[in-house]
Amino acid sequence: MVAGEGFTYAAAGVDIAAGNRAVELMKEHVRRTFRPGVLGDLGGFGGLFALEAGRYRQPVLVAGTDGVGTKLKIAFSLDRHDTIGIDAVAMCVNDILVQGAEPLFFLDYLAVGKMVPERVARIVAGVAEGCRRAGCALIGGETAEMPGFYREDEYDLAGFAVGVVEREELLDGSRIRPGQVVLGLASSGLHSNGFSLARRVLLVEAGYTLERKLPELGRTLGEELLEPTRIYVASILPLLKEGLIKGLAHITGGGLIENPPRILPPGCSLRLDRRSWPVPPAFRLIQATGRVPEEEMYRTFNMGLGMLVVVEESDAGRVKSRLEAAGEKVFVVGEVIPGRREVEFVPGLQ
């Protein structure tokens, strides 16, 4: 569209008015996440958060960033956008939690092919819900309209979380030693990893539709795949503050093979008993349908465990009970053994 003799930004595909409308629609969702420390309101060039210095002796800020990956393709196909923001928050806050940090605030980055205010508001409402579950404030973000870069019905979503921990309470692997017990917290499904493989196997090779109800899942494939990533902050944080947790591993890309070694000190390995927790049907479906090797499954997916928790043997019972009381499904899945920073599975992977 031409205004007078020149082109407008709207003619190039960027609708500033629609962007402003999206901001108005999301404001109340965002404000409901505010916690003590938040300064100002929406609309500033930067989000503001005041750290209460008197509460800490040597505070360390812990930052994490992540995206949702190709799980977004499922949201596009189903035109369901209200929970994908929870995934963006979960991937970030669970990561900083494993360092011992309490999440303080979050920022999101949303890039869209076409600014549809109602859709953007639904996405951000999901981000706000994730922040509420994690106890952190959504203090800012960016929504960029990028015509010609993304299709009109597509977008990308990423986030950035910042938390705080006392320097002496940082979880850096130094508290882990042989003889400690490993607890596994159940995942809610695939979380936000392995979707390129899952989509290839289930949607392309098997030809399933997202609307198809599969008996082994007890719901539609789309509902299973869109299940939000579980956020573990509320259940784990009190135990961290009491010093009962010696190590945490967020099971994301790399699965149970590559993530646990990231937290292990030299001289330690994990032995995990694969018979000690139930593998959800979705993973068995992917493995059987795609003839995916067992080792590939354990390197790609969480296989039913979203977080590993390392505790002293003497504390294992009460930590398990506390986590269960907080709503987690908890399994005693293994132990720390002498080794070379790797995971040993019993029985071994085929």
UniProtKB/Swiss-Prot annotation:
Which superkingdom does the taxonomy of this entry point to?
Answer: Bacteria
Annotated keywords: ATP-binding, Cytoplasm, Ligase, Nucleotide-binding, Purine biosynthesis
Catalysis performed (reactions): 2-formamido-N(1)-(5-O-phospho-beta-D-ribosyl)acetamidine + ATP = 5-amino-1-(5-phospho-beta-D-ribosyl)imidazole + ADP + phosphate + H(+)
Record localization:
Cytoplasm
Q: What is its EC number?
A: 6.3.3.1
Q: What's a GO cellular component annotated to this UniProt protein?
A: cytosol
Q: Name the principal localization, coarsely classed.
A: cytoplasm
- Pathway in which the depicted protein is active: Purine metabolism; IMP biosynthesis via de novo pathway; 5-amino-1-(5-phospho-D-ribosyl)imidazole from N(2)-formyl-N(1)-(5-phospho-D-ribosyl)glycinamide: step 2/2
User: What molecular function does GO assign, one term?
Assistant: phosphoribosylamine-glycine ligase activity
Listed under GO biological process in this entry are:
'de novo' IMP biosynthetic process; adenine biosynthetic process
Q: Which family does it belong to?
A: Belongs to the AIR synthase family.
What protein name applies here? Answer: Phosphoribosylformylglycinamidine cyclo-ligase
- This chain's source organism reads Moorella thermoacetica (strain ATCC 39073 / JCM 9320)
